[in-house]
A protein has these predicted regions:
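A short, sequence-level motif marking secondary-structure junctions
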Residues: 53, 84-91
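Anionic N-terminal interaction surfaces
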Residues: 1-29, 44-48, 65, 78-81, ...
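Phosphoinositide-dependent membrane-docking surfaces
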Residues: 34, 49-63
Length: 104
């Protein structure tokens, strides 16, 4: 049986917020997953992979402050936050939502 290859749909620069740390890297949407890959020079950053079927909610928010343009990814019992460019935030969230709907 041949496994379906994941296709990259969209990739944007992002910072993964972990308490007081902001780990720089990239958010990548594929046909099956949402991935965060930190830059190689980041200390303490780790790669994250979320199966699209496991994502309970994804949303864009705007709060006041230096980490204002955020994408929130919610899974069962876990909440992940990423800071992205304001111009890319809504478009990326919409693309993830479309891909989640296609994977149901």
């Amino acid at each position: 049986m041949k496994l379906e290859e994941e296709k990259i749909i969209k990739e944007i620069p992002a910072n993964h917020l972990r308490s007081l740390l902001a780990i720089g890297g990239k958010l990548k949407l594929t046909s099956k997953t949402l991935k965060f890959k930190p830059h190689a020079f980041n200390i303490g950053g780790k790669e994250l992979t979320f199966n699209l079927k496991a994502i309970d909610e994804i949303s864009a928010s705007h709060v006041i402050g230096p980490r204002s343009n955020q994408i929130h990814v919610k899974l069962k019992g876990e909440d992940f936050r990423f800071v992205v460019w304001a111009t890319q935030k809504n478009e990326f969230v919409d693309a993830v939502k479309r891909q989640i709907a296609q994977n149901k």
